[in-house]
Amino acid sequence: MRINPTTSGPGVSALEEKNQGRIVQIIGPVLDVAFPPGKMPNIYNALVVKGQDTVGQQINVTCEVQQLLGNNRVRAVAMSATDGLMRGMEVIDTGAPLSVPVGGATLGRIFNVLGEPVDNLGPVDTRTTSPIHRSAPAFIQLDTKLSIFETGIKVVDLLAPYRRGGKIGLFGGAGVGKTVLIMELINNIAKAHGGVSVFGGVGERTREGNDLYMEMKESGVINEQNIAESKVALVYGQMNEPPGARMRVGLTALTMAEYFRDVNEQDVLLFIDNIFRFVQAGSEVSALLGRMPSAVGYQPTLSTEMGSLQERITSTKEGSITSIQAVYVPADDLTDPAPATTFAHLDATTVLSRGLAAKGIYPAVDPLDSTSTMLQPRIVGEEHYETAQRVKQTLQRYKELQDIIAILGLDELSEDDRLTVARARKIERFLSQPFFVAEVFTGSPGKYVGLTETIRGFQLILSGELDSLPEQAFYLVGNIDEATAKAMNLDVESKLKK
């Protein structure tokens, strides 16, 4: 067992003999601290500054050692605002890295980077903590077998399947359904896999974090009546926090996820929103520490920092962490070092399309732009691969014909092309699906569709057996049997109207 949780409280580990130093310089969120000779703290140790400011307000600031400067001085980055700190203030070396609470008691709660609850629901009911800095699992512990992580969402499972223990990039602008898709995945992993989820809000808006929390309570992902039945733990480090907190909040969320994988032996979903903000915070810290900037002003340690986070997200023989990471692409430049470094680690991409959302097709996952390294015949099987390729070819041909249809109309197409368009429109609608977490908004019961059912449904559409059914019958249904039943109901309704 790789993980060695301790049983102290959250935040920082306490030592019987406290090693003390004093602040000698403060520049923004960066502190220089002098320690007695031979008492220097290690890199990544947590330091705590306690005292009072000039107006008598209590100060409690936690910092993390980043550099050893020589002359018995260290340079540390603060995890909260440094307002009120003064030179000469006493600093305590905790002798260990930041430690955060882990285990079932974290579910349904919101934490900051230090593992302190910020939801006004009282202390966390656990004394088990884990340090946020840890090496990735050894190769011998990894589960190297390639297997599909079934989500129950048709468009994902068929066209861009997720790898168990893989990393998925989620691309999409505002208002196209990222949050609802994330909540549905959290719900489905809990019901179908007996797993849990951890959401790491890295450097995003406080309002979005609050909206997500409220929507999770409304949809039942977080159970207010019985918090222990919740399916997700939330860790937030918003835009307004110092760069140190934004740089480490992803590790806090990952540490909580690792406990569920290594100790509880569960499948875990780890959401990081947004992975670009992790890089951005690292860039700010790097500049504050005086490192020479690299390409486009990013930190010279960009690949190392990204690798140390991403390599801990993996499948072991005990369980798996499957990570879905929202990726912001600055100025839509895919060659920017931040997204380019992220892409090197991704196994699949899920691209959300505003065009599909405008048509009312949810989830608005773009079937042609979304990709997966798992979509290979030797991994998913010939039947799945062939069906997915034929679906993509049909949709691609429909896309090519749309300009002709817009100018000349459907009647000018050949018989074969008209058939392709009709099937493509059915496929497009069949890729939509009612979600469990959207039941409260739509009134339609949610559907979990197994991979076998998904493949069978699309094969029937492609074979032409369902050409006589109206395309409306395929909209917002689960499996193909529901579509045929809906077609019969529509037929009965139309006859009654006549």
Curated annotation (Swiss-Prot):
CDD domains in the record: ATP-synt_F1_beta_C (cd18110), ATP-synt_F1_beta_N (cd18115), F1-ATPase_beta_CD (cd01133)
Catalytic reactions on record: ATP + H2O + 4 H(+)(in) = ADP + phosphate + 5 H(+)(out)
Keyword Thylakoid assigned: yes
Chief location bin: plastid
General function of this protein: Produces ATP from ADP in the presence of a proton gradient across the membrane. The catalytic sites are hosted primarily by the beta subunits.
NCBIfam families: atpD (TIGR01039)
Protein name, as recorded: ATP synthase subunit beta, chloroplastic
Native species: Nandina domestica (Heavenly bamboo)
